């Protein structure tokens, strides 16, 4: 084995020289230089400084402006809540541990940090699944006279939390476990060992199949059908130009969110899968640290995409920030905002 396994950790460093110490008790400077730990801390500080204000602002602006409280926006707000979970439950912890060079909060703190990070990532993933299904139903019209209303949005939000908890909670109750990963300053699912005592192998397989592969299949199916339908409708001019433009704008925004999610999380998932399927292989701490910390940047991109691509929300945000006046003088809802207030499908 090219790593060192302890009762509640796995350090990707051979202990032939006897230098490996518990990541809960001693600095891990034999894994990387102190300045590299400082760089991780600086990166986490940047994510906190950017992630908290922009996600909090998303929630606050929506509460302040009634016209933003639409069914589709419930799902988008759910993403902001998930991102705040990651900021408070994960980023602040990792910032502190990186400054110390090891996970100073012990196994209990590791469980909490790993839980919040996993929960936030999974809520984001399943929110994108719900958005993909909503876009598919609204644009592709597989059901006639269907109206995506408030109750559907609430059920969609509840579904994302149930599925996220089904992934994040089991390691807390004995099915798999959370351990420090990479440079041992943040925690995640144990992809490094089989650990039969906690049935780790079965959980990792379950996680990759149910909480990554299936959501990706659903998302790609929905958007594959959606692209085909939009092209067909444009060719046949089945919808008004205003309706087509509005639906295209919303669809484009959601697709960009999916692409951004894939860019952030696929490297992490790929490295984790490689480590799990190549038990005992030789890899350094940076190998897992870089994709893990890159994935954490997902807490920033969703609200940025939403603000940049939703004119109605952008106007409301500027009005809120400028004490009730929009400096751009454009305070009317865009076609996207008015169209998505209640998504409706008429008979094809």
UniProtKB/Swiss-Prot annotation:
Post-translational modifications reported in the UniProt record: Phosphorylated on some or all of the serine and threonine residues present in the C-terminal region.
Subcellular localization, as worded in the UniProt entry: Membrane; Cell projection, Cilium, Photoreceptor outer segment
Modified sites of kind N-acetylmethionine: 1
Chain residues carrying a lipid of type S-palmitoyl cysteine: 322-323
Extracellular-facing ranges: 1-36, 97-110, 174-202, 275-286
Molecular function, one GO term: 11-cis retinal binding
Coiled coil residues, start to end: none
Main localization, broad class: membrane
Pfam family, one: 7tm_1
Assembly mode: Homodimer. May form a complex composed of RHO, GRK1 and RCVRN in a Ca(2+)-dependent manner; RCVRN prevents the interaction between GRK1 and RHO. Interacts with GRK1. Interacts (phosphorylated form) with SAG. Interacts with GNAT1. Interacts with GNAT3. SAG and G-proteins compete for a common binding site. Interacts with PRCD; the interaction promotes PRCD stability. Forms a complex with ASAP1 and ARF4. Forms a complex with ASAP1, RAB11A, Rabin8/RAB3IP, ARF4 and RAB11FIP3; the complex regulates Golgi-to-cilia rhodopsin/RHO transport in photoreceptors.
Protein's name in the database: Rhodopsin
Biological source species: Felis catus (Cat)
Gene behind the chain: RHO
């Amino acid at each position: 084995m090219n790593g060192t396994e302890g009762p509640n950790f796995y350090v990707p460093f051979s202990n032939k020289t006897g230098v490996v110490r518990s990541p809960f008790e001693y600095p891990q400077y034999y894994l990387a230089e102190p300045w590299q730990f400082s760089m991780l801390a600086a990166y986490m500080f940047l994510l906190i400084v950017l992630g908290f204000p922009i996600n909090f602002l998303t929630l606050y602006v929506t509460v302040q402006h009634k016209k933003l409280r639409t069914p589709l926006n419930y799902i988008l707000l759910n993403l902001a809540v998930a991102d705040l979970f990651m900021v408070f439950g994960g980023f602040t912890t990792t910032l502190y541990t990186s400054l110390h060079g090891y996970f100073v909060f012990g196994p209990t703190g590791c469980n909490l940090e790993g839980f919040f990070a996993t929960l936030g990532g999974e809520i984001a993933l399943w929110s994108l699944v719900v958005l993909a299904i909503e876009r598919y139903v609204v644009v592709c019209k597989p059901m006639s006279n269907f109206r995506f209303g408030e109750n559907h949005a609430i059920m969609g939000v509840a579904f994302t939390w149930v599925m996220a908890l089904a992934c994040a909670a089991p390691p807390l109750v004995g099915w798999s476990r959370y351990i420090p990963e990479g440079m041992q300053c943040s925690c995640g699912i144990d992809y490094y060992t089989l650990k039969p005592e906690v049935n780790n192998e079965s959980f990792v397989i379950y996680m990759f199949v149910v909480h990554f592969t299936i959501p990706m299949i659903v998302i790609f199916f929905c958007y594959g059908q959606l692209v085909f339908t939009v092209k067909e409708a444009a060719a046949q001019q089945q919808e008004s130009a205003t309706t087509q433009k509005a639906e295209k704008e919303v669809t484009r925004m959601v697709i960009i969110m999916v692409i951004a999610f894939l860019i952030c999380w696929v490297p992490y998932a790929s490295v984790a899968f490689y480590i799990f399927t190549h038990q005992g292989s030789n890899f350094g701490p940076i190998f897992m640290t870089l994709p893990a910390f890159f994935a954490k940047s997902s807490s920033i991109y969703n609200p940025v995409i939403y603000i940049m691509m939703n004119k109605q929300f952008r106007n409301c945000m500027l009005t809120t920030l400028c004490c009730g006046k929009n400096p751009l003088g454009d305070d009317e809802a865009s076609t996207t905002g008015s169209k998505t207030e209640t998504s409706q499908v008429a008979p094809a």
